């Protein structure tokens, strides 16, 4: 009789866990998943809970949940009260002292959602790094995704850290984001900021490049079959090109006089434009956190003040910003009890 003795594995628990995390399954987990999935679950769950049940009466003096009659466009998880400063508002912290209802009333769901959301986005970027390493491709997807992460962190975390409290961050909601955009314009003249201009150029330029690239590829597809649709005219694993780069180059050379000479430079440019635009916008928001000014054309302001017949679109915008500040502040910050006398409210030939 033969006795088979099993070989005892000399692998440690770390190697076993590493194999399990990187196992080929329908939804890849990986080490990054240990950060991504719990944080994403908490952030999404916190947002759904807050927009369904939580009021903003104690922080902003408004209604912000489905339970109070709001719809999808007007619900929000509002920022904490201005008096909370930059407290993390932990459920067990000195502010809420373990009372869940009090924690929600003070705005604890906002810090909960913001921090878990930030770590979830970082986990998603690390997930792309991890899968790229396992598959054996370059990590440019993760590098590209760093741009929206930078923008999220700068707007939702760094900007309010530069201000007096979390109160001045955007609340998590559609209409709430619109309010924040108006606030940015009125108090920082954001649209005239060069970093915002670079961000707009990057986003719109990226959209234009995508549209041009997609149309050009569709225009120059090889007719590999007699099917009615071009989607059946190729095999996903074929070694041959599915469109003609030479024809595309000739087409755009005739239109602009110049064209991309190879696919590598073309696709790098499509990556570079929107990513750098978002990065520049994020840097600009960090500047606003420090209350840095955008372009100020003081000479035009002085001349407009002295000459009622002189105005430019810049001086018009300055007056509009003053109106936003004067009329928005009492509504946006009711706890300050702002009362502006009539003589300081903006008036002039631009309004």
Curated annotation (Swiss-Prot):
Q: Name one GO cellular component term.
A: photosystem II
Annotated residues that bind chlorophyll a ChlzD2 are located at 116
The membrane topology term of the UniProt record is: Multi-pass membrane protein
Q: Has UniProt tagged this entry with the keyword Transmembrane?
A: yes
SUPFAM superfamilies documented for this protein: Bacterial photosystem II reaction centre, L and M subunits (SSF81483)
Query: Which Pfam family is one of those matched by this entry?
Result: Photo_RC
Q: Which PANTHER family match?
A: PHOTOSYSTEM II D2 PROTEIN, PHOTOSYSTEM II PROTEIN D1
User: What is the name listed in the Swiss-Prot or TrEMBL entry for this protein?
Assistant: Photosystem II D2 protein
Taxonomic source organism: Prochlorothrix hollandica
């Amino acid at each position: 009789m033969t006795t088979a003795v099993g070989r005892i594995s000399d692998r440690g628990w770390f190697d076993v866990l590493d194999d399990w995390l990187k196992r080929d399954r329908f939804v890849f987990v990986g080490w990054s998943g240990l950060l991504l999935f719990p944080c994403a679950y908490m952030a999404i769950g916190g947002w759904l809970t807050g927009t369904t049940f939580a009021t903003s009466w104690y922080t902003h003096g408004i209604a912000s949940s489905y339970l109070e009659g709001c719809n999808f466009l007007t619900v929000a998880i509002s920022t904490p009260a201005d008096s909370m400063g930059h407290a993390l508002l932990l459920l067990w912290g000195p502010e809420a002292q373990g009372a869940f209802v009090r924690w929600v009333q003070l705005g604890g769901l906002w810090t909960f959602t913001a921090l878990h959301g930030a770590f979830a986005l970082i986990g998603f970027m690390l997930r792309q790094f991890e899968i790229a390493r396992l598959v054996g491709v370059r990590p440019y997807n993760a590098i590209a995704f760093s741009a929206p992460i930078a923008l999220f962190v700068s707007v939702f975390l760094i900007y309010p850290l530069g201000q007096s409290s979390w109160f001045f961050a955007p609340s998590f909601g559609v209409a709430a984001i619109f309010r924040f955009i108006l606030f940015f314009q009125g108090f920082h003249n954001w649209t005239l900021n060069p970093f915002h201009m670079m961000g707009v150029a990057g986003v719109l330029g990226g959209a234009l490049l995508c549209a041009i690239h997609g149309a050009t590829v569709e225009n120059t597809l090889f007719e590999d079959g007699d099917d009615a649709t071009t989607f059946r005219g190729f095999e996903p694993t074929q070694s041959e090109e599915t469109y003609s780069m030479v024809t595309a180059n000739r087409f755009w050379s005739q239109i602009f006089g110049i064209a991309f000479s190879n696919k590598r430079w073309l696709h790098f440019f499509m990556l570079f434009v929107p990513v750098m635009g978002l990065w520049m916008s994020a840097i600009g928001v960090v500047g606003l956190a420090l209350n840095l000014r955008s372009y100020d054309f003081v000479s035009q302001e002085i001349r407009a003040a002295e000459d009622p017949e002189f105005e430019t679109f810049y001086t018009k915008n300055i007056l509009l910003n003053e109106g936003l500040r004067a009329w928005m502040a009492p509504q946006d910050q009711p706890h300050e009890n702002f009362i502006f006398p009539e003589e300081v409210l903006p008036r002039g030939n631009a309004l």
